[in-house]
Amino acid sequence: MTKLTDNSIRRELSPNVTVAISMAVYGMAMCGGMLLIGLYHYRDKPSLGQFLLSPSVILCVVAVLGLLVASGVLVRFLCGSQGRKRDRRYAVIMSLLVIVLVGGIGEAALRIAAVEKHNGTFVGNFHLLPIQWREFADRQRTLLALSKAGKPFTVADDTLGWIIGPNRKSEDGLYEISAEGLRSATQGEVLRNGLGDCRVALVGDSFTWGDGVRFEDSWAYRLEQLLPKGCRVLNFGVGGYGIDQMYLRYKRDVTSWKPNLVILSFIDPDLHRTMSSYGFLIVNQNAFPFMKPRFVLDQRGTPNIVNQPLPKAEEIFMLPYIHDVPFIEYDEKYNRTDWDRPQWWYVHRSYFLRFLTSIYPFSEKDRPFVSDADMHAVNSSLLNAFVDAVHKDGATPLLVYLPNKRDFKKRSPWIPEGLQILQNAQLEHVDLTSCLKRDSEPNHFIPKGKPHGGHYTLQANAAVAACLGPIVQDRLGRATAE
């Protein structure tokens, strides 16, 4: 009787064994997911140092060790004597069904919640990678075709990448462009008419252009009101520009105006735009089908453009994968694993697997030509080249650092990259951070979520002009005295 009871006990699968089998199966699934993520982010040809320190390699090693341990536990209990084999197999099958059910629910939920935008798939604010290049390129091509059919506000330029078209007016009526392509009070105004002996030229990005405010509220216009009568401020700013394009804009478009003073004003993100070779990777709010010049330094430290003539947009957007795009490796914002790859097509079909590989996007900043050291060196060289070019043309240069919202969130002793570069290069400059700190921060920037969010408010534009006014007058006075 006792013997029969012992046999029946052995045939029954204890709860602890069931839990152990389930945990082993779940552990194998989790380690399999980790291995997938690690392999997906693995670099093609890493150096030995990159291989040993690579997060993807470390993740793969941990995943393989986890798989071995979980497999060992599973085999031990499956081959054990406790309980019937059928019950042990049943525990495995139920665990697998749970995994499939969770994966299926996750897949369905992600597909329901996902929203397609011009730059990829989003679930809320979460970017579901990879970006499908063909879909992305088709959206860019559509905008390109529409722009060629009409009279677009922003037009392609073979040298600068893009410029504001002359004699334009924005759809919302906020911006009007002169006959020469500069921001002006009225559309088609001829700014060259009636220029006096005092001219101040501005080159910069959308913060210089005055994004989000009327012409009369831009700091360029307000600065003009603070200068002696007859002194004109000419706004050559263009949204999305990097330091490289500002330099080229001066060299090509500003010199013929023979300015007395040339202000190059920039924010920190402009430094990273310098390290891009494609405008469509810089601007992520909407489709932006423009190319961009890319400088690199030669062995003597001289900046040279590597992608002139600029590639044709029509040809770029016909390529099957972004990895085939010429000069893409020179673009800091290009991450190989952010984009679809043919060998991983089965991952791209599943939103759940895409979610797993998007949870922690690994950095690829160690690529040649896009490191932080390269960024500092290229921008420093271009800023020096700008100063030298302005002096050579007989004018006075003025470098101005414009703070953006991040500058007010960081605490001392943090120094923005732009100021680091200016200080290390020993370039004379004006830092307007303390100028804007006199006001309360909410007055500085247009709230995010609103049109032109993150740019200067009219109060901030007024503050910039008020701080620059005396400095500009002083520099103009020095130039006249010389």
Predicted segment positions?
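Histidine-centered active-site loop/cap adjacent to the catalytic His
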Residues: 2-7, 15, 449-482
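Serine-dependent acyl-ester chemistry module
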Residues: 4, 26-49, 94, 268-422, ...
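N-terminal membrane topogenic signal
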Residues: 9-26
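Membrane-embedded alpha-helical segments of integral membrane proteins
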Residues: 22-77
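Internal/C-terminal transmembrane anchor helices
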Residues: 85-111
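Membrane/wall-proximal cationic-aromatic binding patches
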Residues: 114-226, 334-357, 361-363, 416, ...
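Conserved SGNH/GDSL esterase-like catalytic core that processes O-acyl groups on lipids
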Residues: 168-169, 176, 183, 201, ...
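Generic structural signal for small/hydrophobic residues in well-ordered secondary structure
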Residues: 205, 246, 262, 390, ...
